[in-house]
């Protein structure tokens, strides 16, 4: 008799995705981040649900309701800090997951890759709206600055901004709708994750060599369930150390001041995970140009399959492109640092140079390096 996991319509789907899934035997720990992102999403949905039970999305009470959660609700402080730092862990895993995809040429699985880009945009939108909810100074001014960027769109821009605000400034209408969207988006993200996995399981996982691994596959369980569990333990350990010992290290002190439309903070900046894109936005003097560069900084990932010139898939045996890749990583760290600095000399020029380097490496240098390597290895 066939065991239930292979027969039952519902369990059969889980079986094909997480138990009997044929997996390349040589995938490294860089392949752990998919499951860790799933864990982060679950943590965020659960903590967010409990926060939503006590939060009020009205400008007069939003800040006080967050203070009430931290002071009066049982373990409210823990739930709040888990949710805030959970977002940071989510983005750390996201960036490493995308970085892994770029390094090992996973972008050649085009449907999975494009679905991943849509997911990245959705998660970024969710995080941005979540940052507005505590209604501190940085929440209010961050929302004002970022939504105002839409006014750069010709003809309809101003109308669009006022439509999103629900008035002539960021106010209760804006906060209420941001809360509604922030609540619903994680569930949409969960659905998109299932589509992401559906596309992935059509082609099967990539592996560190970038070669076809059909001849050497093993079941996902128990080998990779155990391996993923180690990743889960490490993530939870780092997460709890961050949450319990350094809960505010990644936040902005300005957000402990209630929102005040009459008082602008000296340096308006988003959360750390948006700083690289914020630096690219600020490095262009023109408003519309900055907005386009901001969108392109993420959307450029969609061009990666077209910019792949090498006959090899992964970077593991491609030292020139490897060098370009690590320069790109360093460049992103520089952009992150610049995004948090005031707009003055020398930060402006460093930001502009780093922004040019970011696009140049992806669009020009890495494809050229791929062609050079083909010639060196006589692969043409």
From Swiss-Prot:
It comes from the Eukaryota. Keywords: Electron transport, Heme, Iron, Membrane, Metal-binding, Mitochondrion, Mitochondrion inner membrane, Respiratory chain, Transmembrane, Transmembrane helix, Transport, Ubiquinone. Heme b b566 binds at residues 97, 196. Heme 1 (or BL or b562) is low-potential and absorbs at about 562 nm, and heme 2 (or BH or b566) is high-potential and absorbs at about 566 nm. The cytochrome bc1 complex contains 11 subunits: 3 respiratory subunits (MT-CYB, CYC1 and UQCRFS1), 2 core proteins (UQCRC1 and UQCRC2) and 6 low-molecular weight proteins (UQCRH/QCR6, UQCRB/QCR7, UQCRQ/QCR8, UQCR10/QCR9, UQCR11/QCR10 and a cleavage product of UQCRFS1). This cytochrome bc1 complex then forms a dimer. It is found in: Mitochondrion inner membrane. The keyword ATP-binding does not apply. The chain crosses the membrane at residues 33-53, 77-98, 113-133, 178-198, 226-246, 288-308, 320-340, 347-367. Component of the ubiquinol-cytochrome c reductase complex (complex III or cytochrome b-c1 complex) that is part of the mitochondrial respiratory chain. The b-c1 complex mediates electron transfer from ubiquinol to cytochrome c. Contributes to the generation of a proton gradient across the mitochondrial membrane that is then used for ATP synthesis. One of its GO terms (cellular component) is respiratory chain complex III. It is a multi-pass membrane protein. One of its GO terms (biological process) is mitochondrial electron transport, ubiquinol to cytochrome c. Heme b b562 binds at residues 83, 182. A ubiquinone binds at residue 201. Binds 2 heme b groups non-covalently. GO terms for molecular function: metal ion binding; ubiquinol-cytochrome-c reductase activity. Belongs to the cytochrome b family. Its cofactor is heme b. It holds the Pfam family Cytochrome_B. This is Cytochrome b.
């Amino acid at each position: 008799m066939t065991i239930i996991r292979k027969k039952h319509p519902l369990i059969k789907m889980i079986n094909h995705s997480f138990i009997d899934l044929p997996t390349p035997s040589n995938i490294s720990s860089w392949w752990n981040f998919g499951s860790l992102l799933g864990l982060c999403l679950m943590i965020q949905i659960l903590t967010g649900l409990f926060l939503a039970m006590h939060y009020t999305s009205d400008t007069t009470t939003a800040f006080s309701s967050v203070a009430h959660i931290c002071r009066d609700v049982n373990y409210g402080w823990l739930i709040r800090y888990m949710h805030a730092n959970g977002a940071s862990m989510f983005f750390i895993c996201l960036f490493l997951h995308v970085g892994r995809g770029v390094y090992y040429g996973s972008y050649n699985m085009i449907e999975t890759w494009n679905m991943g880009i849509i997911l990245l945009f959705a998660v970024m939108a969710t995080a941005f709206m979540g940052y507005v909810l505590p209604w501190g100074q940085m929440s209010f001014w961050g929302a004002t600055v970022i939504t105002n960027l839409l006014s750069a769109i010709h003809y309809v821009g101003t109308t669009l901004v006022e439509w999103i605000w629900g008035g002539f400034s960021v106010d209760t209408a804006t906060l209420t709708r941001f809360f509604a969207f922030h609540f619903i988006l994680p569930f949409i993200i969960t659905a998109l994750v299932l589509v992401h996995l559906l596309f992935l399981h059509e082609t099967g996982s990539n592996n560190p060599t970038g070669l076809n691994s059909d001849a050497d596959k093993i079941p996902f369980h128990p080998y990779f369930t155990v391996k993923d569990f180690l990743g889960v333990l490490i993530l939870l350990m780092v997460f709890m150390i961050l949450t319990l010992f350094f809960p505010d290290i990644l936040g902005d002190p300005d957000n402990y001041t209630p929102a005040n439309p009459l008082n602008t903070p000296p340096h308006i900046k988003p959360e750390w995970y948006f700083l690289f894109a914020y630096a690219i936005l600020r490095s262009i003097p023109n408003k519309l140009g900055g907005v386009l560069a901001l969108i392109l900084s993420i959307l450029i990932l969609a061009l990666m399959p077209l910019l792949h010139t090498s006959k090899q898939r992964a970077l593991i045996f491609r030292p020139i492109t490897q060098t370009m890749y690590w320069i790109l990583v360093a460049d992103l760290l520089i952009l992150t640092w610049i995004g948090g600095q005031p707009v003055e000399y020398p930060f402006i020029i460093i930001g502009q140079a780093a922004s040019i380097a970011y696009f140049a490496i992806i669009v020009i240098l890495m494809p050229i390096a791929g062609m050079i390597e083909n010639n060196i290895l006589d692969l043409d």
